[in-house]
A protein has these predicted regions:
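Membrane-embedded architecture of ER/inner-membrane glycosylation machinery
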Residues: 2-4, 172, 176, 288-569
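Membrane-integral, polyisoprenol-dependent glycosyltransferases
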Residues: 2-352, 370-373, 378, 498, ...
Length: 569
């Protein structure tokens, strides 16, 4: 076999392996949980508006509310829903999983060109298994869409800089992708690539790149794609749209005038927490990167600036949420892969630290082996909850019982996964003990797959069902036909209720005292928080019980809902 054919075969094999890894981590769990937080149903309502009303240009929430983000994700989710023929959680989450998978594959292609196939394969696997990346790949939010287009934009810029891409058309592709990035999450689509490229140009003193890119005709294409939709949307949405998407979501968010304000050091703990399991090695990576020399080579420098420029920008911005730093992880993943291939056995303090990590990994492995043996002996996968159960309060014991019952539904499959995980942790401990870092890295990838099964198939569904209104709304639909009048009353997050109902629901706005006299009988149906119903019961002792009561407590965990009858208002 010729070298060219062998290289192509390796390329196809590695791409297939990474695609399979993403399939196991992402696509297998798209429908494993209902919507239960604030973010997903909020975006789902815009998708619902596109599918039901055909409002592609400026989709609205509840047919009246202007969404907080541009519609690129919503367009993608609407197309997914139309193709599958269902407006479901899995269909709406599908674009995030696709963008995440494409991002992993693109990072592999870029890393392969810069550092070789083996480093690129590990870099792609690291990105795919990083906690924040996995979470957003399974979330019906706009952040993975932005991350993908920013990643590809920066990768194309560097490929043009290095001369990997020489045809003029690639400049237009680059500018087009930057323009499209704006439709993912606003001006950040331009700001983030510009920060990285600008920092790179300054440090390399390549002033010729300024005129080469800033004066290129592709800039016009970028502006048309990025600003064109905003211009049209402002003419449709008027001052309300401008205030919502430009002032509140961008300028005020950066300056700290729209909530989520935090100090500059806010992201430091999240950098480690969201980067697990790979952030365990982040201190070593950062130390070695600066010790070796920040400007050591162009390829590593570009990745370092990708990470640092974005991290500093998000830290300086007053408005902060953990998910904002998602776009730094593609660069960090490649840097981590390079580090694993450049470092092996260590001496002195570092050997002690590696062996301390090995001891912790070994302890985790032994614990899982004990869990497995106990399950085989007692025929109860959740036997290990029993000693803890006696120490908890009644409410916590009830929650623990739910998790225990969920484990029982998986039977032997959970036991097998626990056993394999235990063996992998022990194997990881051995690799760390002897300083075989590359071997340890691949064991971490396999451990991440096992952890994904436990969290996505067992733990998260239990958490989701405790908060979601899906089951409640399914019962509401059985009692309240499409021809009956359904109303909402009270202050609670109604986005998931409206989504699962399948369309807008009118909201009542009147004092509780006026409503109380009309509750209990009539042709109307009203959904309200349980605590408000209790307040009405205090005024009317003869009030019949609600028709339905939700098991889910809502995104904030404090809004159990009831369905009641009401008279004409």
């Amino acid at each position: 076999m010729s070298a060219k054919m062998k290289s192509k075969s390796i390329l196809m094999l590695h791409m297939a392996l990474l695609a399979a890894l993403c399939g196991v981590l992402y696509f297998a769990y798209l429908g494993s949980t209902p919507f239960f937080d604030k973010g997903e149903p909020r975006e789902a309502l815009a998708v619902q508006d596109i599918v039901q009303r055909g409002e592609w240009l400026v989709p609205l929430k509840k047919t009246t509310d202007i969404p907080s983000k541009p519609p690129l994700f919503h367009w993608s989710a609407a197309i997914s829903s139309l193709i599958t023929g269902q407006l479901s959680e899995s269909a709406i989450r599908f674009p995030s999983a696709v963008y995440a998978t494409l991002g992993v594959l693109f990072l592999y292609v870029l890393g392969r060109k810069l550092f070789g196939a083996n480093v690129a394969l590990l870099g792609g696997a690291i990105l795919a298994t990083t906690t924040i990346y996995q979470n957003q790949a399974l979330s019906a939010r706009v952040d993975m869409t932005l991350c993908f287009f920013v990643t590809v934009s920066l990768g194309l810029f560097y490929s043009l800089y290095r001369g990997f891409l020489t045809r003029e058309i690639w400049y237009y592709v680059f500018f087009s992708l930057v323009g499209i990035s704006v439709l993912a999450k606003g001006p950040l689509g331009i700001v983030l690539p510009a920060l990285v490229v600008g920092a790179f140009v300054v440090l390399k003193k390549r002033w010729d790149l300024v005129s080469k890119f800033c004066l290129h005709p592709g800039v016009v294409v970028m502006l048309i794609l990025g600003a064109g939709w905003y211009v049209i949307a402002v003419t449709r949405g008027g001052e309300g749209f401008f205030d919502r998407q430009i002032i509140e979501e961008n300028l005020s968010r950066f300056a700290g005038g729209s909530g989520h304000s935090h100090p500059p050091y806010y992201y430091i703990p999240y950098l480690f927490a969201l980067g697990l399991p790979w952030s365990l090695f982040l201190p070593f990576l950062l130390w070695d990167s600066f010790k070796k020399g920040f400007l050591s080579d162009d390829d590593s420098l570009f990745l370092k600036l990708w990470f640092l420029a974005m991290f500093v920008f998000f830290s300086v911005s007053m408005g902060k949420r953990p998910v904002y730093i998602l776009p730094i992880y593609p660069a960090l993943s490649l840097l981590m892969a390079i580090w694993f291939y450049q470092h092996g056995a260590a001496a002195g303090t570092r050997r002690v630290l590696y062996r301390l990590m090995a001891a912790l990994a070994g302890a985790a492995g032994l614990m899982l082996i004990v869990v497995t043996l106990g399950a085989l002996w007692s025929h109860d996968p959740g036997w290990f909850f029993s000693p803890v159960e006696r120490l908890l309060k009644a409410k916590d014991r009830a929650n623990l019982l739910v998790v225990k019952n969920a484990l029982a539904t998986f039977g032997w499959s959970f036991t097998v996964v626990a056993l394999l995980s235990g063996l992998l942790w022990l194997s990881l401990a051995r690799s760390l003990w002897v300083g075989r870092l590359r071997s340890a890295a691949w064991r971490l990838v396999l451990i991440a797959v096992a952890v994904a099964f436990i969290t996505r198939a067992v733990v998260m569904p239990v958490i989701a069902e405790a908060k979601s209104y899906r089951e409640f709304m399914s019962k509401v639909d059985q009692q309240v036909t499409a021809h009956s009048k359904l109303l909402l009353y009270g202050s609670f997050n109604s986005d998931p209720v409206i989504f699962y109902r399948g369309g807008p629901i009118e909201t009542l706005d009147q004092p509780l005292e006026e409503l109380a006299s009309r509750i209990g009988s009539g042709d109307l149906f009203i959904i309200m928080p349980e605590q408000l119903f209790v307040e009405i019961q205090k005024q009317r002792r003869d009030l019949p019980p609600p028709l339905l009561k939700s098991a889910g407590t809502g995104p904030e965990g404090d809004a159990r809902l009831v369905l009641v009858r009401g008279g004409e208002l």
